[in-house]
Amino acid sequence: MAKLETLPVRADPGRDPLLAFAPRPSELGPPDPRLAMGSVGSGVAHAQEFAMKSVGTRTGGGGSQGSFPGPRGSGSGASRERPGRYPSEDKGLANSLYLNGELRGSDHTDVCGNVVGSSGGSSSSGGSDKAPPQYREPSHPPKLLATSGKLDQCSEPLVRPSAFKPVVPKNFHSMQNLCPPQTNGTPEGRQGPGGLKGGLDKSRTMTPAGGSGSGLSDSGRNSLTSLPTYSSSYSQHLAPLSASTSHINRIGTASYGSGSGGSSGGGSGYQDLGTSDSGRASSKSGSSSSMGRPGHLGSGEGGGGGLPFAACSPPSPSALIQELEERLWEKEQEVAALRRSLEQSEAAVAQVLEERQKAWERELAELRQGCSGKLQQVARRAQRAQQGLQLQVLRLQQDKKQLQEEAARLMRQREELEDKVAACQKEQADFLPRIEETKWEVCQKAGEISLLKQQLKDSQADVSQKLSEIVGLRSQLREGRASLREKEEQLLSLRDSFSSKQASLELGEGELPAACLKPALTPVDPAEPQDALATCESDEAKMRRQAGVAAAASLVSVDGEAEAGGESGTRALRREVGRLQAELAAERRARERQGASFAEERRVWLEEKEKVIEYQKQLQLSYVEMYQRNQQLERRLRERGAAGGASTPTPQHGEEKKAWTPSRLERIESTEI
């Protein structure tokens, strides 16, 4: 639903009110900004509005100044000429001069809307008459509103064909508060004798919706914008009216009053209304008003008294012919409007096809781009494959060259080996007699070797015999050594006893003078000193006697043995003792050498031990350091995990625990063997 407000336009009372709507010279110059800058839908709506204009406004009396100059004269059969431009048609001409944004001043049309040249005229009209531009066929396609985006998102088509009437909703609101025409305070039913004449004039002068001068800017979306309303000084202010889309229920009419003369008659209040249903206007009201009852067509003109409808005279043939011509002209205009709407629909379809073509071109460009990208990828892959094949070919060529070189080298080696084999065969042929000679020599040597083996066996038997003799002698030597060792032990014991006896004897000899001097110094009883002396002498004598007896016995035994052995035994013993002493010295030297070797081995072993211990210490220290580093890393990982996963506060640097380091004593104890 859209709402309209009509504003009154006051005209000069001295002028004809209908001439106020005639185009001024200034109006034909610059284009109407509403038409020039409006949307394409406004132009389409204007074109359809002009095409559906009714012919009711072309009728009127010829006697009064305020009536339209019409083709009805005295009713003679002379050829009727088209009247000049009606005010509404002139206004439509002024508005349609800039239809679709272009001034087509050189185009002229006849009564039926056919386009003629600028100098030529129609056969049924005068040479200077031109049809209003709203009845012409546009030479250029209408400019449609550019819609961005996809076409399938549009809720409504751009141009609706005018051949189909939209469905009228049941709850639509008609246009209200339309003021009746000015009747100078007298109701329409209570007028004077000219009331019927005024009613006929009113029915004949009704204009359809979409008269000239109206402006539509809906662009096919049901909106009404700035519809100017023309009214004379005799019309009243029209209240705001609300209209349903594509329907106009009432059109402002103008009546001519029945006064004295044409100047006293009232002017018509002409209003132009426009709908907002894709620029379509209904012409049924105009056609119905123009096709009124026959009694209306033959009514008198001027200020005569009105007659009832039953007493009206039948219409004249000229009026019927004019009415039929007007109906024919209206139908032709409807056909032209349908043709224009069809062209506009074709333009819309062309635009749709153009947009689809653009979409297809975009898709084709995308497909080309994708195909070009895929072709580039395939080309790159083919190039990489070609490069890989070239590299493989180069490698195979290099391998082939290497194999050829290796084959040539093997051929040279084969030739060299063949030469060596030939030389070896020649040498073998030369060595055959020498080999035979060496075989005979080998046989001779084998005999000699067997003989030598026999001699070796004999010598081995002699050696074994000698060895057995040596073993016997060694056993005898052991026995002699054992007896000599016993003798030496006895001699040593005798020497020890002799030395001890001699020492005791010397001690006794040293004590004897002191003991002898003691009795002389002290007067004693001759019996007591003798007893003490006897006891002392007895003790000393016992000791001396025992020592002397032992020494004498030993000397006697030694002397006896020495004398018994004789000088030969002594010499042999001395030789044996010298030999034994030499063996003992050699044994001592061997023992010293063995001790020195043992000491050297011990020293080397100690050095190796120290080295091993040092290595173990270093290895253990490295293990300990590795363990400490692992503990530090684990602690850092735990701290990082705690800082990232939980919100536990990290310990401060001063509160961190020191890493465990083993002491030197623990290291030494752990490395001891």
Curated annotation (Swiss-Prot):
Residues 79-92, 653-673 have a biased composition (Basic and acidic residues). Residues 215-235, 274-294 have a biased composition (Low complexity). The modification Phosphoserine is found at residues 316, 318. One of its GO terms (cellular component) is postsynaptic density. Residues 258-269, 295-307 have a biased composition (Gly residues). Residues 317-496, 571-639 form a coiled coil. GO terms for biological process: regulation of dendritic spine morphogenesis. Keywords: Cell projection, Coiled coil, Cytoplasm, Cytoskeleton, Phosphoprotein, Synapse. InterPro entries: LZTS (IPR045329). Residues 173-186 have a biased composition (Polar residues). Residues 1-157, 172-239, 251-317, 635-673 are annotated as: Disordered. Pfam families: Fez1 (PF06818). Interacts (via C-terminus) with SHANK3 (via PDZ domain). Interacts (via coiled coil) with SIPA1L1. Can form homooligomers. PANTHER family: ZIPPER PUTATIVE TUMOR SUPPRESSOR 2 HOMOLOG-LIKE PROTEIN-RELATED (PTHR19354), ZIPPER PUTATIVE TUMOR SUPPRESSOR 3-RELATED (PTHR19354:SF6). Belongs to the LZTS3 family. May be involved in promoting the maturation of dendritic spines, probably via regulating SIPA1L1 levels at the postsynaptic density of synapses. This is Leucine zipper putative tumor suppressor 3. It comes from Homo sapiens (Human). The gene is LZTS3.
